[in-house]
A protein has these predicted regions:
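Extracellular low-complexity Ser/Thr/Asn/Gly-rich intrinsically disordered segments
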Residues: 1-251
Length: 251
């Protein structure tokens, strides 16, 4: 009866994924012997920052992990399985190693920011594993969501794909704060993270054109209280706007 002869194998997966490896007779070379009905048991040497790996003493039809392997770091981790193949006739082959590389998957929580109209916001998430996992070279794609805010008076925003950071210059031409919500998907290589939200509150900036008053008499007072939209739509006076001034003498 033939005895299984299987050589070292490897597989790469993303964090939180499972794997299923089935050795094939004659693959990758004719030296690989996998009799029909071969089963497998294994012991595992887990990576320091990987959970979900375990030994298997009950013979299995393939080398598979039905529990997610989780990489809690922001770099690749390896798990090494020492596998014992046994033919259906009870012939035990030499052990072989199966190395599983677990690539990190980005995990980023929701964020907020606040800027003034005309300013640029920039978000570059930083790694704080295992709470927030940001592998090197993570890219970001996003769309705009505005479920509770009218964005008519907000400009400068757009959906983007595969950006190294999240950054846009936003202009608010209304007289009230506008909040825009970005739905962002982080991606590292082949490993895509769950979407997270970024809320950016954009405060309006006052804009008042030069004002010329009618003449007044000596010892009279004058009051100027600019109003949004008067005398034209260029005038923006957010609630709570205050003023300072200097005087130019007209000699």
């Amino acid at each position: 009866d033939p005895t299984p002869e299987i050589f070292a194998m490897s597989e790469t997966i993303c964090s939180e994924d499972t794997f299923d490896v089935l050795p094939i007779n004659g693959d990758p070379t004719a030296a690989t012997i996998v009799p029909l009905g071969t089963t497998y048991t294994w012991s595992v040497l887990p990576g320091l920052e990987v959970t979900g790996a375990s030994d298997e003493v009950i013979p299995q039809n393939s080398v598979n992990i039905t529990t997610d392997l989780i990489n809690s770091s922001n770099i690749d981790q390896e798990v090494i399985y020492t596998v014992t193949p046994t033919s259906d006739q009870g012939c035990v082959g030499p052990t072989f190693e199966l190395t599983i590389t677990i690539e990190p998957r980005p995990i980023i929580s929701d964020k907020t920011d606040a800027i003034c109209s005309g300013d640029t916001f920039t978000l570059s998430p930083t790694n704080n594993a295992p709470v927030e996992i940001v592998p090197a070279n993570t890219l970001y794609s996003w769309v705009i969501q505005s479920p509770n805010t009218d964005l008519t008076f907000l400009t400068g925003y757009s959906a983007e794909t595969d950006q190294p950071l999240i950054s846009q210059t936003l202009i608010n031409t209304s007289d009230e704060v506008k909040t825009i919500t970005y739905i962002i998907i982080p991606n590292t290589g082949n490993c895509e993270g769950l979407p997270f939200e970024l809320d950016v509150a954009v405060s309006p900036g006052p804009f008042v054109e030069d004002i010329v008053l009618d003449p007044i008499c000596s010892e009279d007072t004058f009051v100027v209280a600019p109003i949004t939209g008067i005398p034209n739509n260029n005038i923006i006076v957010p609630a709570g706007t205050t003023y300072t001034w200097t005087v130019i003498d007209n000699l």
